[in-house]
A protein has these predicted regions:
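Short, charged/small-residue-rich alpha-helical element at the C-terminal edge
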Residues: 238-310
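Walker A (P-loop) phosphate-binding loop of ABC-type ATPase nucleotide-binding domains
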Residues: 46-50
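Catalytic Walker B motif of ABC-type/P-loop ATPase nucleotide-binding domains
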Residues: 165-168
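Conserved catalytic motifs of ABC-family nucleotide-binding domains
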Residues: 161
Length: 331
């Protein structure tokens, strides 16, 4: 029997980052994980959860307060220059020069990374073709749409042939159709380039579609880490969501097939084994309902299960300091 041994290309151990403002804020709280070579690994959580800070530490842009990590075998504290040569980064905010063409932006990037001229020209053509931007290579970046900019930045991140690609909120602010296109390009580069990818996102569907494994991160801590399929399956059944004024939850708790009950914002969510079979009995027990929904579990249900609140409560706009203030108020 031949065993396939997966090699870890990212090793994170007890990583912590504390920011000192008027009070100390723990942005990343003693997290540890490994990422296998060729894996698409997601850091999923609301804005302010610690995702981008974690990515910034791994990219050697921010120093940790304690703990360490190895990227492609290189220590982020002792060998930062070797780490930087091993990674490509697509930032959350566009960082291309608007006055340069797409081609010129990539050429500048190649020069900075010391890619030889002959190799550089071949790679620029290859990566721009990969993201379907070769025909627009001579246009100034300021003439590109948001999706085109993102595609050029994907190409730029790949130009120096990194072992690991960091994507920080790769589809933030893009319309649904453009998001779909970007997902297709990410899947394409995984297939063709065999590159390891770390994605930060607050989009459930993005993490579900692209990631082999997901670490759900909240208030700087990893609350759970597994494949999207396992995370949803481990909830133990389907989800019945009820909007109800006066729920009779005590009787519902006695039903053996109800695995979990969560009440939030005037709604009750039940995790139920074989939900369709038991729905009518639940409705009789729980009382008069305004609406009912029965569906398979989502990553939002996983987040609710582990944190006690829905993911969309935080929204895309919730800032780090506002979330910390809310957290303290609830303690």
């Amino acid at each position: 029997m031949i065993r396939v041994i997966q090699i870890s290309i990212v090793n994170v151990k007890n990583l912590t980052k504390v920011f000192k403002n008027k009070k100390e804020i723990v942005a990343v709280d003693d997290i540890s994980f490994e990422i296998k070579k060729g894996e698409v690994f997601g850091l999923l959580g609301p804005n302010g959860a610690g995702k981008t800070t974690t990515l910034s530490i791994l990219a050697t842009l921010v120093k940790p307060t304690s703990g360490t990590a190895k990227i492609n075998g290189f220590d982020i504290l002792k060998q930062p220059h070797k780490v930087r040569k091993s990674i490509g980064i697509v930032f959350q905010n566009p960082s291309s020069d608007d006055l340069l063409t797409g081609y010129e932006n990539l050429e500048l990037h190649g020069l900075l990374y010391g890619v030889p001229k002959g190799v550089r020209e071949k790679r620029i053509k290859k990566v721009l073709e990969l993201v379907d931007m070769w025909e627009r290579k001579d246009d100034q970046v300021k003439k590109y749409s948001g999706g085109m900019r993102r595609r050029v930045e994907l190409a730029r991140g790949l130009l120096h042939d990194p072992k690991i690609l960091f994507l920080d909120e790769p589809t933030l602010g893009l319309d649904p159709q453009t998001r779909e296109h970007i997902w297709n390009y990410i899947e394409k580069l995984v297939k063709e380039k065999k590159v390891t990818i770390i994605i930060t996102t607050h989009y459930m569907d993005e993490a579900d579609r692209l990631c082999d494994r997901i670490a759900i991160i909240d208030f700087g801590k990893i609350v759970v880490l597994d494949t999207p399929e396992n995370l949803k399956r481990d909830l133990g059944g389907e989800i019945i969501r009820l909007k109800i004024k006066e729920p009779n939850l005590e009787k519902v708790k006695k039903l053996k097939y109800v695995e979990k009950i969560s009440a939030l914002n005037g709604a009750v969510s039940l995790t139920v084994r074989d939900a369709n079979r038991h729905l009518q009995e639940i409705l009789k027990v729980i009382g008069k309902v305004e609406s009912v929904e029965c569906r398979a579990p989502t990553l939002n249900d996983v987040f609710l299960h582990y944190t006690g609140r829905e993911f969309r409560e935080e929204g895309a706009e919730g800032g780090f300091w506002e979330r910390i203030a809310d957290y303290r108020a609830r303690r």
